[in-house]
Amino acid sequence: KKIKVETDAGLTMGGLLYVPDSATEENPAPAAVVVHGWWKTKESQSSTAMELARRGIVALAIDMYGHGDSSNVKFNFVDSYNGLELLAALPYVDADRLGITGHSMGGKCCTAVTEWADQGGSVDVAAMVIAGTDPTYQDKDGAWINAYGSRDVCMIAARYDDFEYHGSTIHGPWYNAPRDYASTDRAKSFVNFGENPANIKDEVQVGKVYEKEIDGRIAKRLLYTPTQIHSWFVLSPVSTGMTVSFLQDSLGAPNPLGASNQLGFIKELFTALGLVGMFMFMVSLVYVLIETPAFACL
């Protein structure tokens, strides 16, 4: 359902809330915030949110501040954390099994959420999927770090991403093609929980779940490199499958399904057909109207 809520900051947040039938007060379900990229809205992530709900995970696709139905204020990452706070307060959500996934700028929100939580925030996530943007590899002094602690983290880095994974700032030279990202020091450090890549001899195995015990919990790291471009992520059944499968495994989805078991792409297809049908109707309506006395003189 479409929602609009006022956050603790006094701002309006718009969103699409997907609640599976299995989520009840007696049997609270895991939940995840789904965050769109820059210049997009919550609807662009509806396929991912819907597939999470089909697996028994409560999903909230938000409009970031400055987008869609949310308050038109300067962009900041607190909107994603506000979304987590909203989910944690729902009686049918298990606040100990929260996750987040985001694409592009939404992926940066995932990293920001961990920073908010580590600074004493009231809620935290157990798992996240970062897509279409680099995670944090180093601290401000350049030291390699595990910025995500014991949280499970999956990264989806498109081989032909036109914005990220080249090892440079937005205005600087590229140090590698995105398709070669898995062989970089950054990727090696990510899957090895922030270890200095100079000490890592093995190459990164794409699709392998790396595990390490941190703070008494087995944390996971996973890297996927699908053959696609940056913007295709929100429509790609492949990326959607990677996202929902990781979250369903990490959060313990009540109704696990295979990665290819999806309806989201079918929904997008019929939405496109509906758009075509609307234009066909408009053209037909014009032809009908010009045959009436009122418009015959045109």
Question: Where are the predicted features?
Answer:
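Soluble extramembrane regions of membrane proteins in the secretory/endomembrane system
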Residues: 2-263
